[in-house]
């Protein structure tokens, strides 16, 4: 049997920012949810780029059923809508469970005890994650102006 892992993804845009600042919070959340052994990926790279070395490594190494744990959607993506859809496709293709620390419905979904609750939370999460990804992209565009 393959043991499930939690792949913590930490990203900051510049070397001046501390990508690891949220590590303890994410490790604590992982432990509280009992998700599995942690593997940490730290990246200082723009969230507007789909092709990121550590994110690619994470997706390459991930196994079906592993958890991808991020602090917030904007740490995962500031991508265009098309690129974000591609990233979501890759995450789903690998069979990763996306858990977002500041989006409690993502971890409520994995704790759901019945299929109806799970399905409802999955729909809510998909909508919220898409909305938050769009807001992260718009926020990035405003900063550039």
Residue ranges and their predicted role:
Residues 1-145:
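Short, structured surface patches at the beginning of a domain
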């Amino acid at each position: 049997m393959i043991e499930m892992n939690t792949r913590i993804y930490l990203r900051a845009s510049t070397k001046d920012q501390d990508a690891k600042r949220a590590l303890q919070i994410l490790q604590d959340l992982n432990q509280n949810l009992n998700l599995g052994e942690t593997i940490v990926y730290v990246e200082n790279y723009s969230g507007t780029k789909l092709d990121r070395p550590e994110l690619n490594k994470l997706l390459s190494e991930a196994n079906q059923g592993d958890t991808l744990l991020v602090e917030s959607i904007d740490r995962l993506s500031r991508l265009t809508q098309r690129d974000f859809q591609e990233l979501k496709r890759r995450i789903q293709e690998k069979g990763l469970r996306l858990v977002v620390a500041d989006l409690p419905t993502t971890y409520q979904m994995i704790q759901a005890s019945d299929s109806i609750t799970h399905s409802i939370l999955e729909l809510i999460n998909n909508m919220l994650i898409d909305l938050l990804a769009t807001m992260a992209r718009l926020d990035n565009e405003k900063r550039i102006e």
